[in-house]
Swiss-Prot record:
Protein name per Swiss-Prot or TrEMBL: High-affinity iron permease fer2
GO BP terms in the entry: iron ion transmembrane transport
Keywords of the record: Cell membrane, Glycoprotein, Ion transport, Iron, Iron transport, Membrane, Transmembrane, Transmembrane helix, Transport, Virulence
Pfam families: FTR1
Lineage, top ranks: Eukaryota, Fungi, Dikarya, Basidiomycota, Ustilaginomycotina
Organism: Mycosarcoma maydis
Example of a GO cellular component annotation carried by this entry: high-affinity iron permease complex
Region Disordered: start-end pairs: 175-209, 441-486
Biased composition (Low complexity): 179-189
First-listed, main subcellular location of the protein, grouped into a coarse class: membrane
UniProt biased composition (Basic and acidic residues): 446-466
Induction profile: Expression regulated by iron through the urbs1 transcription factor. During pathogenic development, expression is confined to the phase of hyphal proliferation inside the plant.
Topology class, membrane: Multi-pass membrane protein
């Protein structure tokens, strides 16, 4: 039985894998939601006008094509995420294979020393990781803001190339852009008929015309195109215009989840590698796989239910559990370093002498039980689990106990400092505030000021909108229809 975890399931690895999977699933979920909004719910004024003139069957056909496009774009997102995950898995497997094949001999020569060092390294990795989990609830807003910035400049933009090219052949070049945009719909239809490029009503609302992910090229050029088009093309006889091409929009849909899952995967490899330094190799795969499944499942539930309350409960529970594990590791690290110094004095036989006299240093200990030994080959399984979870040991030294208490004081002090620095240190109960710090008062005032300024901007925009509409009614556009070339 290992001192830092049993031989099958290491709890620390489970929570680390779950946290990284949750972060990656949030990105994938946000991207999927953005695709739904960009393709299905976003309509221009022209699209809305044309939508009213469609029959029910035509509207249904348009919606079906939009849904098909969203499904194809989601395949690109999943492909990028899986690619990044596979790369991270390959790097992690190579790292663990090298460690467990090359370092075992060095580890066996000074087991107690390495146990103390590995536990200390694990504490330094788990503690910031567990505290970061408390902020995972804000990851949805953070990644939504990042992805909106990524798509803010012509990633998936309205595209009416064929309409514009059709008009370009019939609109006189001497007319300005203003007069061209002010041309009447009847003149536009006449121009399309003359050029032979008239579009149907459903084509105006075709999502593939409204989203810049469809190739605008000849049949020979489409056959020469490679990339992702072949991966997601439907067989002959299906909707041919659902073939995608790799432009800025589709490239972002592929690279953002790839980079995100690769980064989260490599981060998980670093943390899991550090925590597992003192663990047997058999205790790593199962908690890592289960943690990934739990993290992805929680990310899925966030976007299906929209309720973050249960997720916050899980995050707080995970943080408390990881801190409990880390506190036990901190205590064990001091104990193993002290025990290594004792072994150097009396010889290696002290480590194999069982629970009685000679198995521990008779000076500097607080308690010792001749039972309940987590290292015992027989009857120590239950105590070994407690050793993995809370750091139980049948021998307690002053150093190990003081380290355990000091660890919790340090964590509590850090959390109190963070609450104070963020302006959230206040005493509230039953909806009433009985006391709050000066920083909390300043933060509340800044928030109220921002809300007031936002209301003023919205009122100003609404007023400008009403004034512009009234101006249009009083002064209709004087631009006449576009002059057609003969």
């Amino acid at each position: 039985m290992s001192a830092t975890g049993n031989k099958v399931f290491a709890p620390a690895i489970f929570f680390i894998a779950a946290r990284e999977a949750l972060e990656a699933s949030l990105v994938i979920g946000i991207l999927s939601g953005m695709l739904e909004n960009l393709v299905v719910h976003t309509k221009s004024a022209e699209d809305l006008a044309a939508h009213d003139s469609l029959t029910e069957s035509e509207k249904h056909e348009v919606e079906q094509k939009k849904r098909a496009l969203v499904r194809k774009l989601r395949k690109i997102v999943l492909l990028g995420a899986l690619t990044g995950l596979l790369i991270a898995f390959a790097i992690g497997a190579a790292f663990l294979a090298v460690f467990y094949t090359q370092v075992n001999d060095l580890y066996g020569k000074a087991e107690e020393l390495w146990e103390g060092i590995f536990n200390l390294v694990a504490v330094l990795l788990i503690t910031p990781m567990s505290l970061a989990i408390l902020r995972a609830g804000n990851s949805k807003r953070k990644w939504k803001r990042k992805l909106e910035n990524a798509f803010s400049h012509q990633n998936i933009q309205p595209n009416h190339r064929r309409d514009e090219e059709g008009e370009a052949t019939v609109v006189n070049a001497n007319h300005s852009d203003d007069s061209a945009s002010a041309s009447s719909s009847s003149a536009r239809q006449a121009a399309e008929e003359e050029a032979g490029t008239k579009t149907t009503r459903t084509e105006k609302l075709n999502p593939l015309e409204a989203v810049d992910v469809v190739p605008s090229m000849s049949g020979d050029q489409r056959r020469k195109r490679g990339g992702l088009r072949g991966l997601f093309s439907k067989p002959s006889g299906a909707v041919n215009d659902l073939k995608l091409r790799m432009n800025r929009g589709t490239l972002a849909l592929f690279t953002i989840p790839l980079i995100t899952t690769l980064r989260e995967g490599l981060e998980g490899v670093v943390f899991i590698g550090g925590v597992s330094l003192g663990l047997p190799a058999t205790s790593i795969p199962l908690p890592a796989i289960v943690g990934l499944a739990v993290g992805l499942g929680i990310g899925f539930l966030i976007f299906r239910s929209g309720n973050l309350v249960s997720v916050r409960i899980f995050l707080v529970f995970s943080t408390c559990f990881l801190l409990l594990i880390a506190s036990g590791m901190a205590s064990r690290s001091v104990y193993y370093l002290q025990f290594y110094a004792y072994v150097q004095l009396v010889g290696d036989s002290a480590a194999e002498s069982g629970d009685g006299p000679g198995s521990y240093n008779s000076q500097g200990y607080i308690w010792h039980f001749n039972c309940c030994n987590p290292e015992a080959n027989k009857g120590g399984t239950g105590w070994g689990i407690l050793n993995s979870l809370v750091g139980w040991n049948n021998t307690a030294t002053y150093g190990s106990v003081f380290m355990y208490i000091g660890y919790w004081f340090a964590v509590a002090g850090y959390l109190w400092y963070q609450i104070w620095s963020e302006g959230r240190l206040a005493l509230r109960f039953g909806g009433k505030t009985y006391w709050e710090s000066n920083r909390s008062i300043q933060a509340r005032q800044r928030k109220q000021e921002k809300a007031h300024q936002r209301q003023l901007r919205e009122a100003d925009q609404e007023e400008h909108g009403h004034s512009s509409n009234s101006d249009k009614q009083q002064h209709p556009s004087e631009a006449g229809p576009s002059t057609l070339s003969h």
